[in-house]
Curated annotation (Swiss-Prot):
Gene transcribed to yield this protein: PCTP
Stated name of the protein: Phosphatidylcholine transfer protein
MF (Gene Ontology): phosphatidylcholine binding; phosphatidylcholine transporter activity
Residues the record lists as N-acetylmethionine modifications: 1
Described purpose of this protein according to its UniProt entry: Catalyzes the transfer of phosphatidylcholine between membranes. Binds phosphatidylcholine in a tight 1:1 stoichiometric complex.
Length: 213
């Protein structure tokens, strides 16, 4: 996949916004994996790869939507609060902004890295502002693969955020990647059951500390 500057269509943004309002879990074998801290995580087996795609729904309290979207987009700040970031930066390539992200994996597994494009839009849904952020892997020669690090070549994420009507954020997230290599099933299960809710919890804490930095 080698998306250009128009990597995402307006329809993709609208679909993410719509799923925030009404979860699309019927018509496919989505199964509830875990409910914790106000967050529900569902998974769907991808028959082609044998891996799972994930959908996350829930409310993050005491974290306003504008702030949450800003924190999510701020790569420099993420390096301060996300303990799994080894390297993270963005670079202009052929007229578009490309993100390089290297993730720490537990020993003895190799770290993974991602090269991806992302876009953010603000949509209106019945008078409410909805932040939608889309990301997907891309191929860019300015980011050659590194020795000892496994490149994740299939990565896709969708995030939609709006007010919960109080001082929190209602969120929807879709996530799929193919990390490659031989990863024990316990690591994958842990990441889905604990990693995603913990990441969102850490992001709420990061929101509360954002203006202090």
């Amino acid at each position: 996949m080698d998306p250009g500057a128009g990597a995402f269509s307006e329809e993709q943004f609208r679909e993410a916004c719509a799923e925030l309002q009404r979860p699309a879990l019927s018509g496919a074998a989505w199964e509830l994996l875990v409910e914790t801290q106000g967050i529900s995580v569902y998974r769907l087996l991808d028959q082609q790869t044998g891996l799972y795609a994930y959908k996350v729904f829930g409310v993050l309290e005491d974290c306003l939507p504008d702030l949450l979207a800003d924190v999510y987009m701020d790569l420099a700040y993420r390096k301060q609060w996300d303990q799994y970031v080894k390297e993270l930066y963005e670079k202009e390539c052929s007229g578009e902004t490309v993100v390089y992200w290297q993730v720490k994996y537990p020993f003895p597994m190799s770290n993974r890295d991602y090269v991806y494009v992302r876009q953010r839009q603000e949509l209106d849904f019945e008078g409410q502002k909805v932040h939608v952020i889309l990301a997907q892997s891309t191929s860019e020669p300015q980011f050659p693969e590194k020795s000892g690090v496994i490149r994740v070549k299939h990565y896709k994420q969708r995030l939609a955020i709006q007010s919960d009507g109080k001082r929190g954020s209602k969120v929807f997230m879709y996530y799929f990647d193919n990390p490659g290599g031989q990863i024990p099933s316990w690591v994958i299960n842990w990441a889905a059951k604990n990693g995603v809710p913990n990441f969102l919890k850490d992001m709420v804490k990061a929101c509360q500390n954002y203006k202090k930095t």
